[in-house]
Amino acid sequence: MKKIFTFIVLAGLFASCSINSPEPEIKDETEAYEALGTLLIPSSGFTKENLRTKVVLVDQEKLDIYMFEVKFAALMPVTIDMVISDVPYVKNGSLITFYGDSIVPYAGNKPYEKYIVTELEGSITADSMFISNNYGDTPSIYRGALKQ
């Protein structure tokens, strides 16, 4: 019941975002990776297919993660564009690994402090992207294939 309530709250929180809101402004793309994949919310079994995600290496230490038209629950009335900024990363050849904790995500250019991103970890290889994290107390897993 608590998990259903969490998803309803998430849906209500993000319902204020316009369906036709402009995509978030992406910082200068020194190096960027875009993937198309699936977001899974393990606690409910909800999946969002064909989710476009972009990771931009902002500088030598930080990257930003952009998720476009994302939903976290079937009851969520609209999709949102979301940004997780200033994520520390390490690049070793073609492998990029990143991690973070206590990062406030933005949706519709507004901070959502109630859904702080915790236990963020991910990787980008030559052909795939993986992201695992919690939004508040809701775990999520994203797996995608890099666009060539």
Go through the PLM ranges and name each one.
Residues E25-E29, L36, T79-L95, A126-Q148:
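Edge beta-strand at a domain terminus
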Residues L57-D64, V90-G93, E119-F130:
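Short, solvent-exposed coil/turn segments at beta-strand boundaries
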Residues P24-N50:
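Tryptophan-anchored aromatic micro-motifs
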Residues A15-S16:
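C-terminal motif of bacterial Sec signal peptides marking the signal peptidase cleavage site
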Residues F46-I84:
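N-terminal glycine/threonine-rich, aromatic-flanked beta-hairpin/loop signature
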Residues M1-I4:
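Positively charged n-region of N-terminal signal peptides that target proteins for export
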Residues V70-L120:
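Contiguous, well-ordered beta-strand patches that form the walls/edges
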Residues L36-F46, K71-V78, P105-Y112, N133, ...:
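Flexible, membrane-facing loop/turn or short amphipathic-helix motifs
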